[in-house]
Amino acid sequence: MKLVILLVVVSAMLVLGGAQTASQFYCGDFLARTMSILCWPDMPKRSGSQYAGYGWPWLPPFSSSRGKRGIVDECCYRPCTTDVLKLYCDKQITI
């Protein structure tokens, strides 16, 4: 009986531990929300109307944060982990 309980606990740890490091595709709104949760978990959500006046011609260009590849190259076109996403938290994000 103790062996069965031990096997169940070890199996649960493996399943839960593997879920945290699994690679996944992060694109569009899902990428933005995930970055928001990872980088700024305590920030309150803002409404979209605050950004209505901002658009492409007025936004400054971003510099590369990890060479020529950006977060979309690493996590939208190819699967990546949350550990890779966290590398972009303190940097300007390139699309």
Swiss-Prot record:
Q: Which GO terms describe its cellular component?
A: extracellular space
Subunit structure of this chain's protein? Heterodimer of a B chain and an A chain linked by two disulfide bonds.
The record ties this protein, via CDD domains, to:
IlGF_insulin_bombyxin_like
In terms of PROSITE patterns, this protein maps to: INSULIN
One further remark on this entry is:
Silk worm has two kinds of PTTH: 4K-PTTH and 22K-PTTH; there are many forms of 4K-PTTH.
Q: Which gene encodes it?
A: BBXC2
Instruction: Enumerate the GO terms in the molecular function aspect.
Output: growth factor activity; hormone activity
Which SUPFAM superfamilies does the record associate with it?
Insulin-like (SSF56994)
**Per UniProt, which keywords does this protein have?**
Cleavage on pair of basic residues, Disulfide bond, Hormone, Pyrrolidone carboxylic acid, Secreted, Signal
Query: Where does the protein end up?
Result: Secreted
Disulfide bond sites: C27-C76, C39-C89, C75-C80
Q: Which residues carry this modification: Pyrrolidone carboxylic acid?
A: Q20
Name of the protein:
Bombyxin C-2
